[in-house]
Amino acid sequence: MKNSILKYFPNITDTQISQFELMGKLYPEWNEKINVISRKDIDNLYINHILHSLSIAKFLTPIDNTTFLDMGTGGGFPGIPLATMFPNCQFHLIELHT
């Protein structure tokens, strides 16, 4: 995981690395309980979900305290990875289905 994210985002902090690594532990655990993402895709969490969510971060430089709204967040993508990438911004994740 660490290398796949650092390949595209070499300047992320140790805290962010730890948070992304924690996602790799929490998502499979919770996916067993509530099917957060497709069970077939859980082995590709970093490539298909986390890095995919972060793709916009290569082109986005938000000002601190910018507020983002992730409508239809589903399993928390792209909101959770982007909130990790931009910790000085506010993210609101909304999902209609529970």
Residue ranges with predicted function:
Residues 1-63:
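Class I SAM-dependent transferase core
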